[in-house]
Structures are given as structure tokens and as C-alpha cells.
Amino acid sequence: MPLPTSPLRLAMVAGEPSGDLLAASMLDGLAARLPDTTQYFGIGGPRMIAKGFDAHFAMEKLSVRGYVEALKHVPEILGIRNELKRQLLAEPPSAFIGVDAPDFNFGLEHPLRDAGIPTIHFVCPSIWAWRGGRIKKIVKAVDHMLCVFPFEKALLEKSGVTATYVGHPLADEIPLEPDTAGARLELGLPESGPVIAVLPGSRRSEIALIGPTFFDAMELMLQREPGVRFVMPAATPALRELLKPLVDAHANLPLTLTDGNAQRAMTAADAILVKSGTVTLEAALLKKPMVISYKVPWLTGQIMRRQGYLPYVGLPNILAGRFVVPEILQHFATPEALADATLTQLRDDANRRTLTEIFTEMHHVLKQNTAQRAAEAVVGVIEARRGRP
């Protein structure tokens, strides 16, 4: 049914690049269902802005990783949230959509919901993995949760939270069969011979902590597999500058540093060494063997370990419910360990075939036309609140 003809104003907040990707996919679906006069505004990144989103604050202001690191930015982040809350309470939007960034968004959604503004949250925080107490915040803050993983809906509904499983937009975006040859041609990589994609993260703190270890691991892999080539995406000019000292210090490496497009770099690869995060799901959807790693400051790591419920951190392992790819974390992430594990993933053809089967099944489960499903859920919430004509 059509919505009432009065103008719609949808406030949205995405706090990091993965949220920018998710929100941009939702904007596509909303644009097909809502009037052209609908306004989309709040906090967003370049993908959202490219679709006409009005960003009142820079998304990068919220993109801080780790407990200790975040403390330095708390005053600025709280200031942004308070100002946005003031604006939204003064001129209430038709609905508020928080995209990931739960620590920021739940604190905003709660007072908005109390004021009668419908609140929708896109991406359930991983309460099934760690910090399960956040379910209490969800109950208070969120009218409707949009879940990207299938098992989350039942978990939320047990606590009285209305939820819809919408699938993951990456599963819609990525083809079921990756075009490795086409990606190599596009990136100027040789048609044959082993290629390893290396993704050490996108934040300054991540590059500082794990970048040198990844580069040392690449040196060891080159010694043991002389014909190997490496490809590393630099998502932004700022990231390229962060990587430049490491690239210069390892000038002997046969490394192709690309401008952005991590997905294309991973498509071209035979195996991947990757920092944990959403990018590991992309690697799985591309059907690539991988090694997952991370290093965070000691105190942050201790807090994460104490609040965790699952024995794994990588999304491919979480979705499979078991270890299907290796995870080498914290002080275990030595150059030797990373090189050994990555070369094993590169060379083990039987394991490659098994992973292809596992990841293909995973792809089918997550491929749900997310933009359409998410947009339909949002429109449903707005219609229910405003009343159907």
C-alpha cells in the first residue's frame, strides 16, 4: 500500500565502512519504494553519500577500534551523538535507522524510541558471540531489528524483539562463481602462478599492530614459494600512505598495491591472509582459502577474551559453527606461523575443494535480496506507525 503523501524524513547512522556498505544497499531498496521527495540524512560514508545521503557528520569520527583507543575519542563521539539527538528530537524524523555501530546507535535509539520515533537497527550485534548482556539494551532501544544472519531472528524474538532476517548484501553482490582470471587481468597480475592477497586492515592502529608482521610473513612465503605474487588493496589514499613505509622497507617483494577494491584483489588470489572483520565474509563468499588473524592492544584483548562465548572470531568459522579456516591471533600471530598456515591453505587442493563446498552453501543461505527485504521491513514499520491510508 502507498504511504501517506506527507514528506518522509529518514535519519540514518553508519559508523564505519562495513556499515556504509550495508546502508548504501538499503538506500537502493528504499529509493525504489519511497517517494522521490524522501530525505535521507544523518551520519554516513562515501557509498551512502554517492546515493544522495546528506551526511551531517563525517563517518570517520565514529570509526575507532578497541576499548583503550576509543577512550581518547569519547568526548568528541558523545558530543556528536548529543548534537544529533538534539536535532532529531527537535525535528522528529519518520523513522531512525541505526546501521551497525551498536555502542553509538543504541544510546541514540533509546531516547528516540522513548520520544515515539520508530527505531530500526540494521545488523544485530554479535550477542551470540560475546557481550550477551546487550540484549537488554536492544529491548529498550529497538523497535525492529534487521538481521543479516539467519540464526539471529529466533534469538531476538525470545527476548521480545521484533526481527526480520534479510540476508547479507555481500551475498547478493558477489557472484556464486568468482572470475579469478578476469580479476587478474584487470589488476595486471599473471594468468598463472600462485597469488596471495594480503589485507592487514584499514585503520592506523591495525596497520601499526599487525602490518609489520604481515610483511615479514610475506618475506618468508617468498623464500618458501619463490614464484608467489602478492596483492594488497589500499582502500583510501590515507591507507596507502600508512602502508608506504612498509612497502618501501620490503621493496623486494613482488607486491601489487591496488587502489581500493579489496574484493577484486581477493578474487584474483588463490589464498588470502586477512585481518578479522567483515572482509573475511567477503573472502568466504569468493570461495577462497584463508588465514584469519588480528592483533589488538593487550588490555583490549583481555577484555575481548573474557567477554567472548565462542572459540572463534572469524565469520566463516562462526557461520559454519566450527573451524573451517585457521585463526592465528594476538601473540600467536608470528610471521612464521602466518606464513606456514597461509602456504598450507595455498597448496592443499583437497582442502580447497572442501572449502568451496562449504562456502557455496553459506552463500546460498545468505543470498536473500537484502536491499529489497530490508527496505520492505523499513516501509512496513513506517506504515504501521503512521497508519495505512
UniProtKB/Swiss-Prot annotation:
It comes from the Bacteria. Its EC number is 2.4.1.182. Keywords: Glycosyltransferase, Lipid A biosynthesis, Lipid biosynthesis, Lipid metabolism, Transferase. Belongs to the LpxB family. Condensation of UDP-2,3-diacylglucosamine and 2,3-diacylglucosamine-1-phosphate to form lipid A disaccharide, a precursor of lipid A, a phosphorylated glycolipid that anchors the lipopolysaccharide to the outer membrane of the cell. PANTHER family: LIPID-A-DISACCHARIDE SYNTHASE, LIPID-A-DISACCHARIDE SYNTHASE, MITOCHONDRIAL-RELATED. This is Lipid-A-disaccharide synthase. It comes from Paraburkholderia phymatum (strain DSM 17167 / CIP 108236 / LMG 21445 / STM815).
